């Protein structure tokens, strides 16, 4: 299905596809849940979740009430999760097509990848905007390790900042390393430091999606 020729779509612009990636346990599903809850009264949303052998993230989002159950589709990727978002994204592209049959006027399609390493990136065929999430508990050194998720994502999210004192992480060092790794000849690529337990940084993530994705409510 062409995103520019969706049957029964009444909106002029195609849906915005937002890919959310990051290592296991970084907070991808929590971020997706909070984005859906905060944005669903303003925008028409659907979500695709990726797990290797289960549909656990789909279940978690459904139980939490992030969206109506029929607006969340779980994909079992098998094998390496990055394959399903990069080398062969067909399983996710098919999932998007199926969701758009039922919800042709969707404004945003969120695609959450399975937990993966710092080298994972989304195929441009699958995602218009990419958000890469790490968590402070994984170590202060993570931003300076680099990798496409850290250096090339449209938005880089450093999550669980509240855990810094407990794991000996210096947020100032992480911020400085992030600035160094995400500075390009065209300027600094955006990043946000978040504590999703208290909604800290959530508004900035939403503003990024709305601005860069050129969203129009209604």
Curated annotation (Swiss-Prot):
Subcellular location: Cytoplasm
GO biological process terms held by the UniProt record: urea catabolic process
Record carries keyword Oxidoreductase: no
InterPro entries, per the entry: CobW/HypB/UreG_nucleotide-bd (IPR003495), P-loop_NTPase (IPR027417), UreG (IPR004400)
Entry-linked Pfam families: cobW
SUPFAM superfamilies with a match to the protein in the record: P-loop containing nucleoside triphosphate hydrolases
Main location: cytoplasm
Domain of life, per lineage: Bacteria
Keywords: Chaperone, Cytoplasm, GTP-binding, Nickel insertion, Nucleotide-binding
MF-aspect GO terms: GTP binding; GTPase activity; nickel cation binding
GO CC, alphabetical: cytoplasm
Coiled coil: none
Residues the record lists as binding GTP: 22-29
CDD domains: UreG
NCBIfam families referenced in this protein's UniProt entry, alphabetically: ureG
Function as written in the Swiss-Prot or TrEMBL entry: Facilitates the functional incorporation of the urease nickel metallocenter. This process requires GTP hydrolysis, probably effectuated by UreG.
Family: Belongs to the SIMIBI class G3E GTPase family. UreG subfamily.
Assembly with partners or alone: Homodimer. UreD, UreF and UreG form a complex that acts as a GTP-hydrolysis-dependent molecular chaperone, activating the urease apoprotein by helping to assemble the nickel containing metallocenter of UreC. The UreE protein probably delivers the nickel.
Protein name per Swiss-Prot or TrEMBL: Urease accessory protein UreG
Source organism phylogeny: Bacteria, Pseudomonadati, Pseudomonadota, Betaproteobacteria, Burkholderiales
Gene of this entry: ureG
